[in-house]
C-alpha cells in the first residue's frame, strides 16, 4: 500500500513535523491524575484534562460539550448504583464537515489504572519520560498517548487547510477501566457516527471483537466456633468452616472453565473461549475462630455469541448459577444453606465485520506507513463494544505498547505514536472525504 496523493504526503509530513507537540500533549495528559476510581473516591484531574482537550478542539473550530451525567440512583446492570459523575465530565466535540462525506467517531478514555507498586517504576509515573525511543508514564499507551494522537491528527489536517466532507465526532469518556459507564453515558447522550475508532494500543491491528464480563460474588455460609476445640457434627450444632466449604465452589469454577474450553459454542475465530477466574476471597474474622462465612468474587468472560436477546449476559449468569449449585449439591450442608449470588458489572461484548470499510481503510493507511496490521480480537473488553452495540460500528486501533498496559513502566514508542497519528489523519481523509 502507498500514499495515494500529494495531499496525503503533505498530511503525513505535517504529523511528523508535529512530533514534539505530540509528545508534549501526551506529557500534559499523563501529568494529570485520572486514576480509575474505586467506590467513594473523590474526583481527581478529570475535569482539567477534558477542558484541556476541549480547548485544543475549539481552536480547530469544533463545537464542544462537557457534561456530568446523572444516572438513576438505583443503577442497573451497566451503571453501578450511586455512581456520581460530579467532577468527572464526559466530552463530545463535533468538527462539522462540508457535507456529503461519511462521519467518524474518534473515541478515547481518560482514566488510567493506578500506579502501584509506585516504587518499582524507573521514573515518576506522572512525569512522561523518554528512554531509548519510548515514552514511559501511566497512560502512555492506555490510552493518553492514543488520545493525544487523535488530537494531533486533527490539528495536522487543520494546518494543511484540509476540510473534510464528513463530520468528525470526538468523544473522551471516564470510567472505562472500571465499569464502562462513561461510554454508556455518551451513548445515552446521543454520541455516534457512521463508524468509529477507539485509540487503544493495538499495535496497528484492528480489534473488531472483544469478550464481555459479568462479575459474581458468591457467598458460602458456615457456622462459627472455636477453631481449637473439637466440633460435633453440624447437624448437632457443630461449627462449619465456610472457607473449607468454598473449596467445592472453586473446584466447580475450574471444571466449568475446562468444559467451556472444549465446547463448540465457545469457539470464536478471533477470541479465546469464555473463562471464569476467581480473583478475590474474603473469609474469617479471627485466627482461632472457625469462619461463619466466606465469599469469592470471580471475573467471568463471555463471548459475543452468548449475549442474550435483551443485550445482556444473563444467560451466562444462569449457567454459572446452575453449574456451581450442582457442584455442591452432594453436600447436605448446602441443601439447607444454599450459595448466595450477587452480580455486578455486566460489560457486554460486541463485534463488527472484519471487512467493514472503515477497518480496511484504517489498516490500509497504516500499511502505507509500513505498519501492517490485521483484524483481531481483544480477550478483555473495551468501550468500542458499547458504541458498536448502540449502532456505531467501532473498533480499537492504535499504537504499540499493549504488552505494558496496566504494568510498571508502561510505555509507547515515539515512532509508533507518530505513525498512529499519521494513520488516523490519512484515515480521516480517505473515510470522510475532502471538501471540493
Please provide the spans of the model-predicted regions.
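Fold-level recognition of mixed alpha/beta catalytic cores in primary-metabolism enzymes, strongest
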Residues: 132-135, 140-255, 406-422
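Acidic-glycine-rich active-site phosphate/pyrophosphate-binding loop
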Residues: 115-130, 211-222, 364
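Acidic/His- and Gly-rich active-site-bordering loop/insert found
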Residues: 2-135, 159, 163-164, 401
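Metal-dependent amide/peptide-bond hydrolase catalytic core
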Residues: 1-10, 14-17, 34, 59, ...
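Short Gly/Pro-enriched turn/cap motifs at secondary-structure boundaries
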Residues: 81-86, 206-210, 268-269, 375-377
Amino acid at each position: 500500500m502507498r500514499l495515494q496523493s500529494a495531499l496525503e504526503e503533505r498530511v503525513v509530513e505535517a504529523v511528523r513535523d508535529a512530533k514534539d507537540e505530540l509528545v508534549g500533549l501526551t506529557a500534559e495528559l499523563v501529568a494529570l491524575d485520572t486514576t480509575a476510581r474505586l467506590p467513594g473516591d473523590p474526583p481527581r484531574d478529570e475535569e482539567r484534562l477534558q477542558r484541556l482537550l476541549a480547548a485544543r478542539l475549539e481552536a480547530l473550530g469544533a463545537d464542544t460539550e462537557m457534561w456530568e451525567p446523572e444516572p438513576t440512583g438505583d443503577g442497573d446492570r451497566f451503571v453501578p448504583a450511586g455512581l456520581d459523575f460530579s467532577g468527572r465530565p464526559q466530552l463530545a466535540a463535533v468538527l462539522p464537515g462540508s457535507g456529503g462525506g461519511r462521519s467518524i467517531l474518534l473515541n478515547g478514555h481518560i482514566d488510567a489504572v493506578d500506579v502501584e507498586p509506585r516504587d518499582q517504576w524507573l521514573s515518576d509515573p506522572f512525569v512522561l519520560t523518554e528512554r531509548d525511543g519510548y515514552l514511559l508514564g501511566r497512560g502512555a499507551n492506555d490510552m493518553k498517548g492514543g488520545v493525544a494522537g487523535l488530537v494531533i491528527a486533527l490539528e495536522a489536517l487543520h494546518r494543511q487547510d484540509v476540510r473534510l466532507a464528513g463530520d468528525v465526532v470526538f468523544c473522551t469518556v471516564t470510567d472505562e477501566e472500571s465499569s464502562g459507564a462513561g461510554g454508556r453515558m455518551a451513548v445515552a447522550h446521543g454520541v455516534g457516527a457512521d463508524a468509529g475508532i477507539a485509540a487503544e494500543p493495538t499495535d496497528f491491528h484492528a480489534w473488531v471483537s472483544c469478550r464481555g464480563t459479568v462479575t459474581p460474588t458468591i457467598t458460602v455460609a458456615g457456622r462459627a466456633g472455636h477453631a481449637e476445640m473439637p466440633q460435633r457434627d453440624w447437624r448437632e450444632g457443630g461449627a462449619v468452616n465456610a472457607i473449607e466449604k468454598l473449596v467445592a465452589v472453586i473446584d466447580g469454577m475450574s471444571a466449568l472453565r475446562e468444559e467451556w474450553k472444549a465446547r463448540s459454542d465457545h469457539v470464536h475465530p478471533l477470541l479465546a473461549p469464555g473463562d471464569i477466574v476467581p480473583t478475590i476471597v474474603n473469609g474469617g474474622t479471627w485466627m482461632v475462630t472457625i469462619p461463619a462465612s466466606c465469599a469469592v468474587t470471580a471475573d467471568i468472560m463471555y463471548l459475543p455469541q452468548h449475549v442474550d436477546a435483551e443485550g445482556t449476559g444473563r444467560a451466562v449468569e444462569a449457567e454459572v448459577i446452575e453449574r456451581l449449585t450442582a457442584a455442591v449439591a452432594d453436600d447436605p450442608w448446602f441443601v439447607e444453606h444454599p450459595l448466595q449470588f450477587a452480580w455486578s458489572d455486566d460489560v457486554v461484548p460486541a463485534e463488527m465485520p472484519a471487512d467493514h470499510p472503515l477497518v480496511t481503510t484504517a489498516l490500509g493507511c497504516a500499511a502505507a506507513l509500513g505498519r501492517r496490521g490485521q483484524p483481531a480480537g481483544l480477550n478483555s473488553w473495551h468501550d468500542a463494544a458499547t458504541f458498536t452495540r448502540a449502532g456505531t460500528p467501532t473498533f480499537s486501533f492504535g499504537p504499540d505498547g499493549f504488552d505494558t498496559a496496566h504494568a510498571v513502566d508502561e510505555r509507547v514508542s515515539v515512532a509508533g505514536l507518530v505513525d498512529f497519528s499519521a494513520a488516523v489523519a490519512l484515515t480521516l481523509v480517505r473515510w470522510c472525504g475532502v471538501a471540493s
